Swiss-Prot record:
Keywords associated with the record: Cell cycle, Cell division, Cell inner membrane, Cell membrane, Membrane, Transmembrane, Transmembrane helix
Protein name per its UniProtKB record: Cell division protein ZipA
Species classification: Bacteria, Pseudomonadati, Pseudomonadota, Gammaproteobacteria, Alteromonadales
Periplasmic side: 1-6
Biased composition (Basic and acidic residues): 108-118
SUPFAM superfamilies: Cell-division protein ZipA, C-terminal domain
The gene coding this protein: zipA
Highest taxon of the lineage: Bacteria
Topology relative to the membrane: Single-pass type I membrane protein
Length: 336
């Protein structure tokens, strides 16, 4: 019995150790490798895939990076080699010419510079001649562009028509069936403006007075601006009228006269004008709504009294009260 327990204990320990080892191995396998190890592994695998000459199975060699400027262009090498060889020949020629003519090397710098410049000019001419001997392909592109430009200008250029040329445009011919016979236009009945119905004989007159306080007068220079601000207009009988239109057009609603005889105004001499008061009157029946017209007249009288420092009186020259207003409204309703 004790042996069996020992065997089971050993087997359990081995199983636990195996599980732990397998767990650590799985965790380590799942962890990403460091960058250095991966790069090293890639380099080793890449080297194993290539042969001794550096080519893989597809015959592709390793990538080589070439630094810029390590190799000159062929054209530059050709152009630089020609002047060097020519200059060497030119220097040898200069030395031969100097020895043949007996020139001493102790010449001044200015005297020696002139033949060198001449020889260099000759050398440049020789190089230019050698370069010009190479065949040069003509560039017809510029000529082609000019030709196309000329053609475009010719096509765009407008054609002027002289007076001697006549352009004949044929009018479309229509059959007899397409010609519609003109139908006489139906006469339009012009609606004449309706004339307002005559008001008839006046049946009543509503009167309001605006009178200055005792011992005072209303000055014309102050009265005229107030009348104009209230839309009064100077008109017939040399008095002011309030029209249905604020601009001074339309039917007369009520009028305003001087309370003193002869009851008229002179707009040209309003600065020298003065009076004890003015009177407003409205005849019944009147144009429009009588109650509305009376309301405008009453408001105008009260506004003038406030502006001129005066008082409003009724037709009997008594102080205006609410009782007088109700009496005037009753008279309006009796006629309308």
């Amino acid at each position: 019995m004790e042996d069996l327990q020992l065997v089971l204990f050993v087997l359990g320990a081995i199983a636990i150790i195996a599980v732990l080892v397998h767990g650590f191995w799985s965790i380590r396998k799942q962890q990403p490798k460091p960058i250095k190890e991966r790069t090293r592994a890639q380099n080793i695998s890449e080297a194993q895939r290539r042969d001794s000459q550096g080519f893989d199975a597809d015959g592709i060699g390793a990538v080589r990076v070439r630094k810029p400027g390590t190799e000159d262009l062929p054209s530059s090498r050709n152009h630089t080699s020609v002047p060097v060889m020519t200059l060497q020949k030119a220097s040898a020629t200069d030395a031969g010419v100097a020895s043949s003519h007996g020139y001493s090397p102790e010449r001044t710098t200015a005297e020696r510079a002139e033949p060198v410049r001449a020889e260099r000019a000759a050398t440049n001419a020789t190089v230019a001649g050698s370069m010009n001997t190479q065949p040069v392909t003509p560039q017809p592109a510029s000529y082609g562009v000019q030709g196309v430009t000329a053609e475009v200008k010719q096509s765009v250029e407008p054609q002027t028509i002289t007076p001697s040329q006549h352009v004949h445009i044929e009018s479309p011919k229509y059959g007899a069936t397409t010609q519609a016979s003109p139908q006489p236009a139906s006469p339009v009945q012009s609606q004449a403006p309706r004339e307002p119905e005559p008001l008839g004989e006046p049946q009543d007159v509503l009167v309001l007075h605006v009178v200055a306080h005792e011992g005072q007068e209303i000055q014309g220079a102050e009265l005229l601006p107030c009348l104009l601000s209230l839309n009064f207009k100077f008109g017939d009988m040399n008095i002011f009228h309030r029209h249905s239109d604020n601009a001074g057009n339309g039917k007369v609603l009520f009028s305003l006269a001087n309370m003193m005889k002869p009851g008229v105004f002179d707009p040209d001499n309003m600065e020298q004008f003065c009076t004890q008061g003015i009177v407003m009157f409205m005849t019944l029946p009147c144009h429009g709504e009588a109650q509305h017209n009376f309301s405008i007249m009453l408001n105008s009288a009260e506004q003038l009294a406030d502006d001129l420092g005066a008082i409003v009186l009724d037709e009997q020259r008594k102080v205006w009260t609410e009782h007088n207003k109700q009496d005037y409204l009753r008279r309006i309703k009796a006629i309308v």
